């Protein structure tokens, strides 16, 4: 049972700065998210101005524009790492999604993994390799097996993610990953059903939405599967048993709170055939494109996209930052 967020503001009297673009590798996805968010916000009755933090003139407009809330459609570095959150807090402008701390921790897969483990949230075995570190591929294979996932630590949208097998492929993936980011997370490969769970709220009020099962057309849920039309099928609620559903939702809320997140997050999981479940990462600014999972989860509990956007604005106004 999902309890809708009570709305105490009037959308028609609320000026929204929709922040999108930025300078990260996820800029194209951010702009696509902004298209969906802008349509939803305008349908809800808001006055919406889209601004790009990568443009100095837009930053000045953000300061001087008399906005009531910044609605974040920024993905990746500069948008999900605490940077824009710190700027917005400095100028006293409420904003959607997580604060400085939650954003900074969640974007770093290596740090998030530490918090998962401390909270008893199952997550695949892994190791961190930083740019400039001496490493031995044979050591990686000995610890994690000869099939692994190599992930750029602070990139999203499956940028810098490689599923590789054998020492040669692992070595190439490590080199490529460290060209993209300053460190990589190397994880034991896990084969299973891909699941994701949206959480809304914070602390004791955080609640999980229905679990979504992701069926990618490619071998894994990569960039193309996420954003190309027809790249993946989303089944909501997921075709898993009640116990697995409850466990995913419990771990998603635990991850949301352990990382200090607020507003809306989406945590990705893998479920093996034997019932073992693994948390992979938590996204603090979930996508809002036509193929995104956040609107799908909201629809499953009877919440339209404009209604969802309104709830996100309300949580921004209510946040104690």
Residue ranges and their predicted role:
Residues 1-101, 105-107, 111-114, 118, ...:
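ATP-binding N-terminal substructure of ATP-dependent carboxylate-amine bond-forming enzymes
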Residues 2-14, 118-120, 241-321:
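ATP-dependent carboxylate activation and anion-phosphoryl transfer catalytic cores
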Residues 18, 165-250, 273-278:
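Phosphate-binding site of ATP-dependent enzymes
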Residues 30, 124-126, 147-172, 194-196, ...:
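Glycine-rich phosphate-binding loop of ATP-grasp-fold ATP-dependent ligases
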Residues 48, 94-95, 123, 148, ...:
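Hydrophobic beta-strand scaffold residues
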Residues 49-53, 184, 188, 262-274:
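A short glycine-rich, hydrophobically flanked beta-strand micro-motif that places a catalytic Asp/Glu
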Residues 116-117, 141-159, 181-191, 195:
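ATP-grasp fold ATP-binding core
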